[in-house]
Amino acid sequence: MLYRLKLLLSGQNTKKERVRAKLEIDISIVFVMLGLLIFGWVMVTSASMVVALDDYNNPYFYSIRQGFFAVIAIFLFLLALLVPTKNYEKNYNAFFFIMLIVLVAVLVPGVGKSVNGARRWIPLIIINIQVAELAKLLAIIFFSGYIAENLPKMTNFKEGILTPITLLGCIAVLLLMQPDFGSTVVISICVMGMLFVSGNKVRWYGLLIGAMLIMATMLVIISPYRMHRITGFLHPWENANGSGYQLVQALIGFGRGGWFGDGLGNGVQKQFFLPEAHTDFITSVIAEEIGVIGLMILLMVYLFIVFRAMNIAKMAFELKRYYQAFLSYGISFWIGFQVFVNIGVNTGLLPTKGLTLPLISYGGSSLLIMCFTLGILVRVDFENKLLADTINPKYIYKKVRK
């Protein structure tokens, strides 16, 4: 079965290419993804049963939906494996316009769905698509193409800073109109990271970081609900029943779990004490039920994905596949930063912000997009191996099954 999948991925029928198709695809990422999907489904089930019973009179409502989306996500992962990355590279400009269209569409009354004053979803038949999740992937696809095409000019101010930051600003404005400050920060960090590894001049980043801090401060000052979150973050225990309530309850979960946890399913905070226990604050539930040791193991799994993505990017650079290199770097920055923010929010290191824990938190859009993204990453690695074997069969990848 695996051999047939490899053969299908190669898109070749000659005897020589069939031999090359036997090169191992990165099974480690596949196993890690499946492991996180299963673990996430178990934790969502544990964290959501009480809330689901109260909201829908069915304790497995969120669990069933999460399992359903996980199955679809696996098919999307396989679909991404079948698409050559050159297709993204050739049409990267089109992905920018697609991103603008969906970001504008969600703001149109009757098209976008408003929940608690935020208009972030486009309802489809079986799922509400959170367009910010799609925008993260589309932004990485687009900026990878832009940087790869202008790589010799990236040391120039116009091509290296002015143009990409202007385009990023357009995306940020549309995201902030939803409003979705968290996704704006994630995309900005990914793009800035990609610009940095492209060889941009370091001194420009001081100006960029300063400008972004000033803008972030202004956004907090002019927005009462953001100021409310900052107050709760700085003084959570003084506002334990107000703006700091969610953070205090999350920290109580960490305290209850200790090093080894209270046991799977035995958490207390998910029982109406901790809001959004199955989504943004599922990390606290994990810490309460399997302990800090279990959470550290989970963090190591995420670090494996991040460093594996960086290694894939490095190999793509060595093979002069610059688009694929920046694509892989962007994916590594995305996953790494989002995990960092989610855990930071749950532990009180960062202000409360609605970002999911990749592949674990409840949410169809996040699950589907992330699995498709990992499929792209594995595809990049597979193409790297085929090209390396074509250049020199003894070059790095020697594992060919006889």
Swiss-Prot record:
Record membrane topology: Multi-pass membrane protein
**Pfam families according to UniProt:** FTSW_RODA_SPOVE
Q: Which reaction does it catalyse?
A: [GlcNAc-(1->4)-Mur2Ac(oyl-L-Ala-gamma-D-Glu-L-Lys-D-Ala-D-Ala)](n)-di-trans,octa-cis-undecaprenyl diphosphate + beta-D-GlcNAc-(1->4)-Mur2Ac(oyl-L-Ala-gamma-D-Glu-L-Lys-D-Ala-D-Ala)-di-trans,octa-cis-undecaprenyl diphosphate = [GlcNAc-(1->4)-Mur2Ac(oyl-L-Ala-gamma-D-Glu-L-Lys-D-Ala-D-Ala)](n+1)-di-trans,octa-cis-undecaprenyl diphosphate + di-trans,octa-cis-undecaprenyl diphosphate + H(+)
Metal-binding listed as a keyword? no
Cytoplasmic topological domain = 1-24, 85-91, 143-160, 203, 306-324, 379-402
Q: Where in the cell is it found?
A: Cell inner membrane
Which InterPro entries does this entry report, sorted A to Z? Cell_cycle_FtsW-rel_CS, FtsW, FtsW/RodA
Output one GO BP term: cell wall organization
Q: Which residues lie on this side of the membrane: Periplasmic?
A: 46-63, 113-121, 225-284, 346-357
Enzyme class per UniProt: transferase
**Main localization (coarse):** membrane
Q: Where are the transmembrane segments?
A: 25-45, 64-84, 92-112, 122-142, 161-181, 182-202, 204-224, 285-305, 325-345, 358-378
Its annotated pathway? Cell wall biogenesis; peptidoglycan biosynthesis
What family does the Swiss-Prot or TrEMBL record give for this protein? Belongs to the SEDS family. FtsW subfamily.
* Purpose: Peptidoglycan polymerase that is essential for cell division.
List the PANTHER family hit by this protein, alphabetically: CELL CYCLE PROTEIN, PEPTIDOGLYCAN GLYCOSYLTRANSFERASE FTSW-RELATED
- HAMAP family, alphabetized: PGT_FtsW_proteobact
Q: Which NCBIfam families match?
A: ftsW (TIGR02614)
Q: What is this protein called?
A: Probable peptidoglycan glycosyltransferase FtsW
Q: Which organism is it from?
A: Francisella salina
- Gene behind this protein: ftsW
